[in-house]
Amino acid sequence: MTARTLSLMASLVAYDDSDSEAETEHAGSFNATGQQKDTSGVARPPGQDFASGTLDVPKAGAQPTKHGSCEDPGGYRLPLAQLGRSDWGSCPSQRLQWPGKEPQVTFPIKEPSCSSLWTSHVPASHMPLAAARFKQVKLSRNFPKSSFHAQSESETVGKNGSSFQKKKCEDCVVPYTPRRLRQRQALSTETGKGKDVEPQGPPAGRAPAPLYVGPGVSEFIQPYLNSHYKETTVPRKVLFHLRGHRGPVNTIQWCPVLSKSHMLLSTSMDKTFKVWNAVDSGHCLQTYSLHTEAVRAARWAPCGRRILSGGFDFALHLTDLETGTQLFSGRSDFRITTLKFHPKDHNIFLCGGFSSEMKAWDIRTGKVMRSYKATIQQTLDILFLREGSEFLSSTDASTRDSADRTIIAWDFRTSAKISNQIFHERFTCPSLALHPREPVFLAQTNGNYLALFSTVWPYRMSRRRRYEGHKVEGYSVGCECSPGGDLLVTGSADGRVLMYSFRTASRACTLQGHTQACVGTTYHPVLPSVLATCSWGGDMKIWH
């Protein structure tokens, strides 16, 4: 190389250095002359940080440079790092300080002919390549964080902690979590359960744990067992508020054995039915998850040691409480909505649902004994009359010519229709209830009133007494008579609980029971002032 060439290169370098010192604008954004201003000290939106993978490089990038050289062919310098910054994203070594101003960095407007390592990976803050790659590994969205890192980081930020906590988060230091706590957290994450949710029992198809039904009698029930039933008093206060179901509660029933009547059975749309101690403690004694779909109906066996359940999964189960085993399992041809035991032969029960027929099952053989067919689509409720030789069924027929199908009286032995001209109004009857002393029964109607009928043929409806004031609005709102027969109780679609005088049909009391529709009400068979109610919101209340 000649001496003239060397002198020319030296003059160019000197001219470039003097020009860069004379300039006052910082690098970072382009002006009209193609220069770039430094915006590293300006707060960037989260989407424009280097962690998001977006670089502040101009559309007209630099020419490809030679590796190992400090200057590009056009006489422009490479981007330099601002070493004096101590905020997030600067050079990791804080001991190095830049003595003066930042040197200006300019870029040519011409498009690069090929991709360059420097132009494609220069971060917005102009840090060295090693620091940029280190930051990219830690904060880039393209590299997912581990679950423990994400958890520790969220906890640290949520506490607004000290710099030590932030440094701990940045360095990925995760505290040790015992195995027992990790398993509990994993279980709560998978099932979505909280601390206040009741256990839901074993998975469907498995036998539940045995429920010990001791020989003792509740101290609240014992004084009333050997005495005559007193007049029913109107409850005013809530004794227990039972929560545990994750879906609407369909039905509730007290245990029919008086000495064990502290137990309450509830069915729900969450595929379970539960047994509660609703008199002494208000705790859930056992949860049964035998069904794969909603449990629409369940009944205590008259012995008080077994529960018959049926649901939308077409399955029927008879469960022994003391052993937890299934004494009977059957499969119906339709979704089940109502079940009733025969009042005399406790090995026989009736089953109705989304079908035009009802079926009588024998538990001893596990087979269908008899079928009762009508031109309907669904059976809403079944009610046995005294001695069990006759029973009533309410259906969903509500057309103009449905006077022969709304309520039907059947002969149990011959499966013949005794009468089908019982209810002549264009309303369906979602529930039926028998009076304990008088030869009458009640029918809940979608006309927002309770109708009174005779239990003796021809089953005439009373025109003088009609119990009005509540709302049904399509819900399966239940109704019942008190054990003494002097009061009637019904739920309402607006959550209220209403009581009527049986003799005068006047309203005796109104309770603001639930926030959603109250669909079930039942008096305690022994305690004269205890009432249980359930709602479509999944909760139950014990009134006293």
UniProtKB/Swiss-Prot annotation:
InterPro entries: WD40/YVTN_repeat-like_dom_sf, WD40_repeat_dom_sf, WD40_rpt, WD_repeat_protein. Residues 30-39 have a biased composition (Polar residues). Expressed in heart, muscle, testis, ovary, uterus and prostate. Signal peptide: none annotated. Coiled coil: none annotated. It comes from the Eukaryota. Transmembrane segments: none annotated. Residues 17-74, 183-208 are annotated as: Disordered. WD repeats lie at residues 244-286, 290-329, 330-373, 375-420, 424-463, 469-510, 513-544. Keywords: Repeat, WD repeat. This is WD repeat-containing protein 25. It comes from Homo sapiens (Human). The gene is WDR25.
